[in-house]
Amino acid sequence: MFNTHKVEIEWGGRPLTLETGKIARQADGAVLATYGETAVLATVVSAKEPKPGQDFFPLTVNYQEKTYAAGKIPGGYFKREGRPSENETLVSRLIDRPIRPLFVDGYKNDTQVVITVLQHDLENNPDILSMVAASAALTISGVPFMGPISGARVGYIDGEYVLNPNIDEMPESKLDLVVAGTSEAVLMVESEAQELPEDVMLGAVMFGHKSFQPVIDAIIKLAEVAAKEPRDFQPEDLSELEAKVLAVVENDLREAYKITEKQARYAAVDAAKAKAEEHFFPEGVEETEMSAEQFATIFKHLQAKIVRWNILDTGNRIDGRDLSTVRPIVSEVGILPRTHGSALFTRGETQAIVVATLGTGEDEQMIDALTGTYKESFMLHYNFPPYSVGETGRMGSPGRREIGHGKLAWRAIHPMLPAAEQFPYTIRAVSEITESNGSSSMATVCGTSLALMDAGVPIVRPVAGIAMGLIKEGERFAVLSDILGDEDHLGDMDFKVAGTEFGITSLQMDIKIDGITEEIMKVALEQAKGGRVHILGEMAKAISSSRAELGEFAPRIEVMNIPTDKIRDVIGSGGKVIREIVEKTGAKINIEDDGTVKIASSNGKEIEAAKKWIHSIVAEPEVGEIYEGTVVKTADFGAFVNFFGPRDGLVHISQLAADRVAKTTDVVKEGQKVWVKLMGFDERGKVRLSMKVVDQETGKEIVAEKKKEEVDAE
């Protein structure tokens, strides 16, 4: 019934298996991939014909994690998977980026790649396996995909590169880098690092590229026996029509791209396009030599060509800068004084308002992953409203791009955050992009660094980011620093580098062509370093290190540690005690399983009151010390006094006063505040207290009585 084909190799010390022909046979391509004991199913379906009037390639990549893969049942009311998690969105983008440029130019059929995690061994992350499976499914599907590709994760542990470190090894690694590409070229890099130098980062990229070559060979081996017939798709030859359009628009476009102001430049480009449309689509003429879709494709292509020619021929860019100059930068902090920390970062026509908010442990984000539930104490949210580019558009929940850009900035800042023991706050940074003309994600990095320092978060060092571009024609190439929005799409390599003066904390690269050598990437990274250091210098004009004190409106958190066997005493039955402490003092209290207690309030007196209360519960009373207490019960033989948190002790009738007492209630009443001295414990461990040795007015010990007690004891 099944015509199955299977390829197995050893990769990174674990077996990798690719199998097709048994599951999802009605898809154009389907591959079940297993690495260790983690298993994913990748499927590809592509429409037989493009939709009429389609002028772009509608590729969708959906990566989905099923909770059954880790032996779990989803939480929530419906008990089933819902909208994609942040991680699912990020992995979908991770797979999309290297495969998208490998579809043949002009292919516009609706194409969907779906990757489902079926089993997770809690050791091998399914993201790399999903990329491999998607590549294999595309390669055997018959769609015009110029792959295969593969991917690999590279760690850096004890000065050595590690291929596909397992989940338990990652905390030890100074690098989390994912690289993807073909057998010939690197196409995509995504990483987080702990201030690593450029040569180590580039070495990791090349190590990863070399390490995944056996996987590409395995995919080719599978395709040789299982691939479907390639679709009969011939890209449309528009070269003759392009030459005709170029003759009409070249001068106008060259003049338009000399205009440095974005909106004026766009208007000039639109005017050039309208003029060409009048030429090729005269009013009243039905038969034209090209369709509107063909003209749109050609015009877009020519825009890129002319800008590329100008840069390579003259070394001058759209806005008049040379290749390595960064746009003018203005940094401001404290622009919203009632927030905990704020910054306005402006670089040319790109601008971000970033606001930092500090919270307590209650504000941490609970993340329910396949590997288990954990808390995240640092959140960075990136918002890109349509007005930032002078347009109208959809507002609402963040899209894939916003989630991806936010995570890139998160990776850049995260390695520089203080340890939880040093700074026990939950941190949320929100970046509002108010203007955009290239590299808003890197503006977010710079703005977040400024806002955190303004908030008093003791980050290790300031972090800055820069977006770079690269254009290559034959042997000629140009590396562009701080690219504009118009330069973002026409380059052969776009990459974003963030870090401190000492090293890289995040690197993202997207390479669209073959021929980008290691040497070219080295030049590009060195130029990016110069730009990053320049930006850090400009940021330092506003603030160069974290403020010594938190903002006026930020909560204060103090940490104390209690014995783990006392946690239940502080919480109380059903949370009764801790609720009372919170209600009476006004402070927020968070207790960890290891006995760490975080007490938060914007009022220092509330924190002290809560600390004192908790201390009274967990501390042991000391013999010879004097305590203030409350009479909770009277009896013929004495009074019971609550004197040390929930602790009670007996003041025997003989210890109530210096004179003889006939009746307990002659001296004390229930609810009365008294001073007592802890005399010791009886043979049953019961507390013995005395009032007569303490001045009930001042709470001071009566010295004469003290000496008498010492004599009596002898």
UniProtKB/Swiss-Prot annotation:
The keyword Protein biosynthesis does not apply. Pfam families: KH_1, PNPase, RNase_PH, RNase_PH_C, S1. Its cofactor is Mg(2+). It comes from the Bacteria. SUPFAM superfamilies: Eukaryotic type KH-domain (KH-domain type I), Nucleic acid-binding proteins, Ribonuclease PH domain 2-like, Ribosomal protein S5 domain 2-like. The keyword Transport does not apply. Involved in mRNA degradation. Catalyzes the phosphorolysis of single-stranded polyribonucleotides processively in the 3'- to 5'-direction. The gene is pnp. This is Polyribonucleotide nucleotidyltransferase. The lineage of its organism: Bacteria, Pseudomonadati, Pseudomonadota, Alphaproteobacteria, Hyphomicrobiales. NCBIfam families: polynuc_phos, PRK11824.1. InterPro entries: ExoRNase_PH_dom1, ExoRNase_PH_dom2, ExoRNase_PH_dom2_sf, KH_dom, KH_dom_type_1, KH_dom_type_1_sf, NA-bd_OB-fold, PNPase. It is found in: Cytoplasm. Residues 555-614 form the KH domain. Residues 624-692 form the S1 motif domain. Its EC number is 2.7.7.8. Disulfide bonds: none annotated. GO terms for molecular function: 3'-5'-RNA exonuclease activity; magnesium ion binding; polyribonucleotide nucleotidyltransferase activity; RNA binding. Mg(2+) binds at residues 488, 494.
